[in-house]
Every structure is written in structure tokens, then in C-alpha cells.
């Protein structure tokens, strides 16, 4: 058995939960993923939402995120899987308040590419691959849809 007598560090920077939180909350996802040596992820139960994504052509799985230290609000390239599965599906996620719809509560909404099916009450693991952009309030739903299409192209190119 090996017992470490010094804190873990990389390039003279001590890796701590405080440092990881700081990086997460400032949008430095690449740093977090490097320090963890894996993709930062959230596991949660899919809950029924207001169906806003579905109404505008981008159905989402709304993930319960209470009890998590969260990343900077914004749009992310992600991949997700059911907890007991090994098959990941790429997608895009909005972590935030949905300012175009005057949202008050922070939500994680995940749109999975080439997926159809019912995920309600299933548990998903969502791995965050890349920060795409900060959350923004759009003047109308058409502007939001136009931006989502641009974000989808970026997310699909993410490895």
C-alpha cells in the first residue's frame, strides 16, 4: 500500500476541490477535465419539463442537478448514456436559466443527436466535452432556434 505524504500537484499547482470548483465556475472545462483525467460529468434522473425544447424542434432530457457543484452556465458539447449502459450518444446541453423564456431555476437540458425514445425517470450520465458559449437572452424564439442550429454544428464536430 502506498500512502501519499504530499498533495497531488501538476506544474507546481496543487490539485484540490477548491481549484476544480474555481475552474468549473469560470468555464475552464478543459482544465477540469485534464486535472480529473476524465470528463467532468453529472449523473441525474430525467424529469418532465415544460416541453419547450420539443415545441421548438429540439427535444431535451431535463436532468435533476440538485446537490451538484455546477459549471459556468452556458451551452456545452456533451455525450450521455443511461447509467447501466456503455453506449454514449453525443449531444448538446444548456446548463442555465433559459433567459429567453424568463427561467428562474437553473436546469440541465440535454438534446441527444439521432435519438428518439422516452427517457423519463431514467438515470443518465452526462459528460461535458466542450464549453461552446455563454448563455444569452434572445429577442425571440426564432433567433434562439437559429443560434441552436449553429451550436449543433459546433457540438457535432467536438470529439
Model-found features: residue ranges?
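Anionic-ligand-binding alpha/beta catalytic cores of soluble enzymes and soluble regulatory domains
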Residues: 8, 13-61
Amino acid at each position: 500500500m502506498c500512502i501519499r505524504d504530499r498533495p497531488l500537484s501538476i506544474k507546481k499547482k496543487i490539485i484540490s476541490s477548491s481549484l476544480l470548483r474555481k475552474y468549473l465556475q469560470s468555464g475552464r472545462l478543459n482544465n477540469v477535465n485534464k486535472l480529473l483525467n476524465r470528463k467532468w460529468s453529472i449523473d441525474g434522473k430525467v424529469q418532465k419539463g415544460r416541453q419547450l425544447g420539443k415545441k421548438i424542434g429540439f427535444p431535451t432530457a431535463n436532468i435533476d442537478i440538485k446537490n451538484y457543484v455546477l459549471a459556468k452556465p452556458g451551452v456545452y458539447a456533451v455525450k450521455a448514456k443511461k447509467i447501466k449502459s456503455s453506449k454514449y450518444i453525443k449531444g448538446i446541453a444548456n446548463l442555465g436559466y433559459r433567459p429567453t423564456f424568463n427561467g428562474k431555476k437553473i436546469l440541465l437540458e440535454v438534446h441527444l443527436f439521432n435519438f428518439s425514445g422516452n427517457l423519463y425517470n431514467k438515470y443518465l450520465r452526462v459528460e461535458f466535452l466542450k464549453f461552446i458559449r455563454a448563455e444569452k437572452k434572445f429577442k425571440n424564439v426564432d433567433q434562439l432556434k437559429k443560434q441552436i442550429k449553429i451550436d449543433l454544428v459546433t457540438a457535432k464536430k467536438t470529439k
